[in-house]
């Protein structure tokens, strides 16, 4: 099983999370791709995709993702296992918290992918409904807030990595 971790990062937080995820899952399994430098077409060569997207300003897509957003429509991702993680500021921008994560999830849902890594909303304060499912009980991916809950990020990343490994194993069983 080969995993490609694709991310966009303007302030390095999404990139730092990518490196932590790679280190936990294993550098022999996970290859990092900064969308600033690498084409999204590379996603097609992986069995598993981990995609990191921060939300900018008032619910906007980060610039590296925005530059390749339309290219995602042309990719063949049918049957791929996809785990998402997002970065945002739940207190300063609660009504747009992780909107980009929700937009990416909705875009990929049309591509026939299998999602893993939904994450509980408990412990977060926000009002946006874009990044949630299950009557608001789950985020569509790991939710990270380096502005207000940086002290929880390492534990959340560790727990989420264990969770997605278990869910991936079920898909391959």
From Swiss-Prot:
Record keywords: Electron transport, Flavoprotein, FMN, Transport
Stored InterPro entries: Flavodoxin (IPR050619), Flavodoxin/NO_synth (IPR008254), Flavodoxin_CS (IPR001226), Flavodoxin_lc (IPR010086), Flavoprotein-like_sf (IPR029039)
Top-level taxonomic group: Bacteria
Transferase is among the record's keywords: no
GO-annotated molecular function: electron transfer activity; FMN binding
Residue ranges of every copy of the Flavodoxin-like domain listed in the record: 3-165
Cofactor: FMN
NCBIfam families in the record: flav_long (TIGR01752), PRK12359.1 (NF009023)
Family note: Belongs to the flavodoxin family.
Function: Low-potential electron donor to a number of redox enzymes.
Protein name (Swiss-Prot/TrEMBL): Flavodoxin 2
Gene name for this UniProt entry: fldB
């Amino acid at each position: 099983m080969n995993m490609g971790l694709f991310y966009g990062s303007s302030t390095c937080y999404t990139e730092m999370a990518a490196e932590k995820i790679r280190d936990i899952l294993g550098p022999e399994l996970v290859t990092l791709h900064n969308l600033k430098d690498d084409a999204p077409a590379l996603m097609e060569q992986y069995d598993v995709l981990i995609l990191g997207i921060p939300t900018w300003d008032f619910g906007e897509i980060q610039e590296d993702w925005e530059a390749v957003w339309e290219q995602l429509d042309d990719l063949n991702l049918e049957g791929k296992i996809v785990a998402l993680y997002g970065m945002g500021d739940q207190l300063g921008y609660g009504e747009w918290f992780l909107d980009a994560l929700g937009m990416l999830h909705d875009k990929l849902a049309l591509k026939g992918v299998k999602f893993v890594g939904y994450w509980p909303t408990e412990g977060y304060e926000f009002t946006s409904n874009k990044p949630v499912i299950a009557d608001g009980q789950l985020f569509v991916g790991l939710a990270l807030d380096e502005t207000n809950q940086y002290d929880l990020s390492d534990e959340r990343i560790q727990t989420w990595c264990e969770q997605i490994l278990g869910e991936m194993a079920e898909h391959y069983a």
